[in-house]
Amino acid sequence: MDEHFQPCLDGIDYDDFSFGSHMVEQKEPLMETAVGPYLVIIEQPKQRGFRFRYVCEGPSHGGLPGASSEKGHKTYPTVKICNYEGMARIEVDLVTHSDPPRVHAHSLVGKQCNEAGNCVAIVGPKDMTAQFSNLGVLHVTKKNMMEIMKEKLKKQKTRNTNGLLTEAELREIELEAKELKKVMDLSIVRLRFTAYLRDSSGNFTLALQPVISDPIHDSKSPGASNLKISRMDKTAGSVRGGDEVYLLCDKVQKDDIEVRFYEDDENGWQASGDFSPTDVHKQYAIVFRTPPYHKPKIDRPVTVFLQLKRKRGGDVSDSKQFTYYPVVEDKEEVERNRKKVLPQFPQHFGGGSHMGGAGGAGGFGAGGGGNLSFPYSSGLGYNNLYSSSPHPVGCGYQGGVQMKAASERDGDDRQAPTESTYCRELQRHRHLCHLWLLARRNAHALLDYSVTADPRMLLAVQRHLAASQDENGDTPLHLAIIHEQTAVIKQLIEVVVSIPSQQIINITNNLQQTPLHLAVITKQPQVVQLLLEAHANPTLLDRYGNSLLHLALQAADEEMLRMLLAHLASATPYLLHLPNFQGLLPVHLAVKAKSPACLDLLVRKGADVNGVERQGGRTPLHLAVEMENLNMATHLVKKLGANVNSRTFAGNTPLHLAAGLGSPTLTKLLLKAGADVQRENDEPVSPSSVRVPSSDTDGDPEEQEQEQAMELGEPALSPHPTPEEEQEEAGPRQRLHTALDLTRSQKVRDILLQASQPSPPILSCPPPPSRNHLLSLDTDALQGLEQLLNQYGSGSDWMELAKRLGLCSLVETYKTTPSPASALRSYELPGGSLGGLLEALDSMGLRGAVRMLRKPEPLEKLQSTEVKEDSAYGSESVEEEQAARLKPRPVPEGELPHSQQQQQVH
């Protein structure tokens, strides 16, 4: 048997798998033609479920199984040389999972393997099949990875030569090893099979085209598990996208997973669900928002597919169906009610319509001066008077309030009942009297209306009908608001409120909408004011739990919101802190509406700028960061003072979200506003959840454990303990995710790393002020300071102060503004100190301004000035210390005055 190893094939151009002349000295041409010999894989290796092992763990319990291996029927990776009979040599080694395949740091071990990490089998002359039944994968540690890679690359270079490597070749090998270490995935390998046939000299040098197996995943790697969708809370959503879906799945890596939507047709449309690493909960649940469908307008539901997909490996789960439905433009059904066909009245008064007879004063009857027709109905009331009936109630009359006798009516219009009793006649008589009085009252109302032209005369006698509802549950007041009949609305309100103990003004329709809700939805501030002044209940909610404030903010209606907040009175605090059925407060909807003006109105009235929604505990700042709305986030942080370190129910701060989204601008904004870069959320860091950024860092706890065991000469535990067992045995607290652990952007990573390092001290600058001495100017103080600065001439005005505070770049910007001294806000925001401002004013001779800024100090701070500080050198009052600090110190030679040392703020 010829044990001379042929060159490794990593120098091959894998597009056509041809050898380079520098690798092999060919004695005969390759025997590969259309009908020549070739190598084929008969049984692929099993892709998942096989564990790579470290040296200290010993050999594997059984070799790498085949893809079709089952209990009771074992199979193993198998290859065959076709179109050839004779002796042949088949070698198998490990290569990377990416193309082109390159040498892998791991090695093969087993009975057929050598120290170089390759396995060899001799086949022929008849049976050309080779089965590798005892293959194992030896897992290299990151600590030893570099040396092993250089050794393998050296053997590859010198395999077919006996010469020594030059310095240039050694440097080239080291660079290649470093590059491979950066890109190589230690949890995935592939088998490369290469067949060698005998040449004329009897040596195995004629190489056939190599074949590469399917990827083999290390079973202990999170990426090795099969992707599976277990459950979703929604299977349908709007064609516009943006619907929030909760998806339960098997274990995934939060930085290597996406939710793919696609259509399996000729169009090939696909899109990804929108979520960040912070939306992946404990690696078993994903909260994502659906992408918009590629056709924004559809007339019927469309079914697509969704699946989980790994970004790096490309593995996918089984597909699930998802349905996009058309947009419901008129969700509140306002437009539908506006388009309803109204009854058509005849142009003449010839009668016949159930809405009124001829010659009569708007009665119900046969018309033409006809007779009265009052069929008895025991259920007569205002709720069924509007409903049409095959026997309409008649109450027509001629020229005056006259009615024919009941006996005459009975004789003319209907046949006498066969069974008539005294009680029945009495009941009928009472009913007829009631209708007669009603007709007389209506007639008088019509006469009064003819004299005064006031519609309220007609409505007053019909006020008991104001609570009647149509098939949608809408009252006359609902319909008047829907059709924006302002004059009718005023008249109906005046009539309705005159009913004692009435609640007609608060009646809801079938959509749980009150007239007040519809007035807000249809954007009629004047009507809303009328209803509120008529004591309509502003705290009632619609079917989605939305209050009046929610409805106004959903439409981003600043005018409506301003009017509501001005007239809600005692209900304002309750509504400002009332969530809807989705758990959103009004401040959250203001952020979603991208309206800083609405947000200012809410906060000014007492809304909590740090209020949390009920689903995930997000504040308005969390939502602004999720929306990547820099303007809104800046407004919340700088103007409204939102807490940049607030935490969701999962412990995520806005900085976690910004880092997860990979937004450098939002990250810088939050860090500048005081976000804690070391703040952790509630999810423990697992070995697989954090990717090691540096190739020189060995951050795998499992590998460190294995290496420590090898150094101590102790056998490693096998099988490997579960994460739950490791957590129980762990003594110290497990580290949780910081923003740095969640970012996928190198720019954001650099920003966070820089922020996490302590700033080097600057000798020429005073130490940063403590939190107790930070500058905080209210509007009154700023206006007072501006008046003092403008009283003096050049050299002591606000421009000179700006120069002394290092704000020279802002002088031209604020020069033409109504309040130039507001440039001090740019000194205040990054943490400018009160002491620095007082010293600058004192050096300009503005003692009055110094006294004004000192005056509003808190009582406890003034009391603290009387406290003496003891030391071994005596006692000195804090007041004297402050006076000494404010006194201009002598300037040494070569040093600039303090006014020129201030750091310039841009």
Swiss-Prot record:
Residues 345-374 are annotated as: GRR. The record marks A439, R440 as: Cleavage (when cotranslationally processed). A motif (Nuclear localization signal) lies at residues 336-340. NF-kappa-B p100 is one of the high-molecular-weight proteins complexed with the v-rel oncoprotein in transformed chicken spleen cells. NF-kappa-B is a pleiotropic transcription factor present in almost all cell types and is the endpoint of a series of signal transduction events that are initiated by a vast array of stimuli related to many biological processes such as inflammation, immunity, differentiation, cell growth, tumorigenesis and apoptosis. NF-kappa-B is a homo- or heterodimeric complex formed by the Rel-like domain-containing proteins RELA/p65, RELB, NFKB1/p105, NFKB1/p50, REL and NFKB2/p52. Component of the NF-kappa-B RelB-p52 complex. This is Nuclear factor NF-kappa-B p100 subunit.
